[in-house]
Curated annotation (Swiss-Prot):
Organism listed in the record: Mus musculus (Mouse)
Alphabetized PROSITE patterns for the sequence: TFIIS_CENTRAL (PS51321), TFIIS_N (PS51319)
Superkingdom as given in the UniProt entry: Eukaryota
Gene name of this polypeptide: Tceanc
InterPro entries on file: TF_IIS-typ, TFIIS/LEDGF_dom_sf, TFIIS_cen_dom, TFIIS_cen_dom_sf, TFIIS_N
Name of protein: Transcription elongation factor A N-terminal and central domain-containing protein
Location of region: Disordered: 84-118
Domain TFIIS central: 182-298
Length: 359
């Protein structure tokens, strides 16, 4: 299949995918277009520009938009080089085309970072590709037809290499700008949370410096995973804003806790003393309930005093140690040893004791 037929097929498939909103399959088609040599005749006689522009306009993926925009910028630079100076040698044409392409991509990056008016630039880019005069249709054969297929492939490879470097540079620049803004916002959130309960305005600079130090330590811990970094920031802010965790601010002011220690603290470490005691009681109760049998039929007695409610209304039985789920510090070598097991009928308290004989 010739390059023209491949371009027509790719353009038609891209338009179908955009119409059906199957955006996950468009990336492969754009990659194939990058590997195919596209001449000025192809830009004139096919709808590839319109198809790529539809991706740029309708696709929600930022990666696909950048790839489509780089393709359009490359084609515009190629069209300008062949349209304005068609009689130059292949080497000069290759150099000028790369310069035009680099200037176009650099202009796109500067416009994205400063004004954000990429829509008008994209419209101009597509119009420059599609606005071809009738007499230009007869010139490409004289301008490019004298070049060998090897020279054409070298030009195409030069475009791809230059385009990849410019796109990588653009992506890294945009990512760095976004990361700086995210980190600044996180410092602001930490400062607001730290100073939420502060009434003394003289301590404002203390909280500002502390917020910066905390953010730097958190970023150092999770610099390779931005999701974990954001999750840690949200956790720290929520715990600092919790009125029950006022001990965190007090520890900062007293110097008992540093910014690095706070950045490395887990959710359990940041909890208040009341919550820690509640968790410990729940854990102890759960372990005790898990160790004891679920239902035991025993003998009622009023000779045993409940250790919780101090009432004499209990039910007692004897069971084998091997039937209980006991921790290692309670177990011994004899699973058949009998244990006295007591249930309070008033409050439901349950407990057991080894070698205990009830009167």
């Amino acid at each position: 299949m010739s390059d023209k037929n491949q371009i027509i097929a790719r353009a038609s498939l891209i338009e179908q995918l955009v119409s059906k909103r199957y955006f996950e399959d468009i990336g492969k088609q754009l990659t194939e277009l990058e590997m195919i040599y596209v001449s000025k005749e192809h830009l004139q006689e096919t709808d590839v520009v319109r198809a790529v522009y539809r991706v740029l306009k309708n696709c929600p993926s930022v990666t696909l938009k950048k790839k489509a925009k780089c393709l359009l910028a490359k084609w515009r630079g190629f069209y300008k080089s062949t349209h304005c100076k068609p009689r130059q040698s292949p080497k000069v044409l290759h150099t000028n085309a790369n310069k035009e392409e680099s200037a176009a991509v650099s202009q796109d990056v500067s416009q994205d970072e400063t004004s954000g008016s990429s829509h008008s630039e994209i419209m101009g880019l597509c119009s420059s590709l599609s606005r071809l005069l009738p007499q230009d249709a007869a010139k490409p054969a004289a301008a490019i037809g004298s070049e060998s297929s090897t020279a054409q492939m070298e030009i195409n490879e030069g475009y791809l290499k230059g385009d990849d470097s410019e796109c990588t540079r653009k992506s890294s620049g945009v990512f760095q700008g976004t990361l700086v803004s995210v980190r600044s916002k996180c410092v602001e959130l930490l400062y607001t949370a730290l100073a939420s309960s502060c009434t003394d305005h003289t301590e404002v600079h203390i909280w500002q410096n502390l917020a910066r130090e905390i953010e730097e330590h958190i970023f150092t811990l999770h610099s390779n995973n931005i999701k974990k970094y954001k999750t840690s920031i949200r956790s720290k802010v929520a715990n600092l804003k919790n009125p029950r965790n006022f001990h965190l601010q007090q520890n900062f002011l007293s110097g008992t806790m540093s910014a690095r220690e706070f950045a490395e603290m887990s959710v359990l470490d940041m909890a208040s003393q009341e919550l820690k005691q509640l968790r410990a009681s729940y854990t102890e109760s759960s372990i005790q309930e898990h160790c004891l049998p679920q239902s035991v039929d025993g003998t009622w007695t009023n000779k045993i005093k409940c250790r919780r409610c101090d009432k004499y209304n209990c039910k007692v039985t004897v069971i084998a140690r091997g039937t209980l789920f006991l921790p290692s510090w309670v177990q011994n070598s004899n699973p058949d040893e009998q244990m006295t097991y007591v249930i309070c009928n008033e409050c439901g308290e349950q407990w057991y004791h080894n070698n205990w004989v009830c009167l």
